[in-house]
Amino acid sequence: LIRLKAGQTHLLDDIDHLKNRRVRLSGELIQTQFRIGVNRLERVVKTRLNDPTVAASFFPDPTEQALLARQAKKRRAMKQTKTGSQLTRKLHATGRTGHSKEKLRQKSNDIAVNSRHARWTSFVRTSVISSTMREFFGSSQLSQFMDQTNPLAEVTHKRRLSSLGPGGLHRDRAGLIVRGIHPSYYGRVCPIETPEGKNAGLVGSLASFAQINADGFVMAPYYKMQKEQIRPNTQGFFLLTACYEDQAVLASGDVNLAKPRVSTRLRRAFTEHAPKKIDYLGLCPIQFMSIATALIPFLEHDDANRALMGSNMQRQAVSLLRSERAFVGTGLEGRITRDSGSLLVAKQTGYVTYADAQRIEYVTPKDDPTGTQFKLIAHSVELESYHRSNQDSCLHHRPLVEANTWVQKGDCLADNTATFGGELALGRNIFVGYMPWEGYNFEDAVLVSERLVFDDLFTSIHIERYDVETARLQDGQEYFT
């Protein structure tokens, strides 16, 4: 309280600070839902146990149970005496008395176990847990179909952060403060990429190098600075949480350390310090933005609103019939396609033995510690051929390797519909003229060449599924015409 009286307001708790927020991953959400299902099952079991008719079948009266046991024992003894003599004569004739007795005893034990299992399965209904999990995956606000429009949309959807859902905020009651950009977002949450409309500021995306620790806090990587020199560790960098950042002086990865004073951040404030006062240095300039925003060339010259629109519109680009690599890129096109999982790469260096539109086969040498044997391991990679995605677009692989050729570890084996040579290819490179043309492009109108249509430059394939039902009527079976 004395420090607050002195004006040290940085000691106040900030609800929007990332040190006071944690990320609940999908595994934790599923675990919580499974716990709800187990609790429901417990209540169902307790309810059925309280039912006298149900409980009597599992916990009968001891006196009655003893009487029933004696009667059952007498019946078994009489039955064994009656059938034992006949069975013994047959077994002695064949010479397999001991083996058949053991088999008969095992069969009776199995029948007893199955009867007890049948009683408990009719008593404990696992459908309660199944319906709870189905409810989460089918109707939860945080359960969505993966966006498969292009590889960038897949990666962005997997790295999305949402403040909505159970235990979160409501879009109609969230104000401007909670939607705003907090200084602790630097290097953790992208300040640019967010939806337009009611979800603005409530749904975001992880920064390019951000990671989430076991406690659910978002961490950002930094280089440790000591005497104006980078002090590496085993990883080469340090991962800092937002709570630890408040105690250090941080600088961006593109500052000029030769200047007497550089721009820094300290306790959520942007200030200036001498280079020797810097505690941590950022990795690179794109550290604070998401991967979709990092794909925009010359982002520093863009307006903030246009950068936001460009980040969202890239995810809406439909895969074309003929893809083409962009002339101007940022260097992340190849890494995004590999991280999305839609690109097929060689796991080891090997020799391609067979390649067609359906599969690619290659062999790799097996490591032998003794060095006396040479063995080959065969690998087969299945290719997708005109599969329908969640957005009714086309998922197709084109092989890039031929038979009787060598491939290195990490080489691209096949392209998909949104890649070219292993790099992301969203759209085509076209020549654009910014000029009037006899009034045809008045205001926001666009005049295009007929080559865009006849040469299929922007032609895409869509696969849709339609279900038609037939019924069996009194007059006969319906059929398609």
Which residue ranges define each predicted feature?
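Active-site diphosphate/adenylate-binding microenvironment
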Residues: A6-G7
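Short, charged/polar, low-complexity loop and linker segments
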Residues: H10-L12
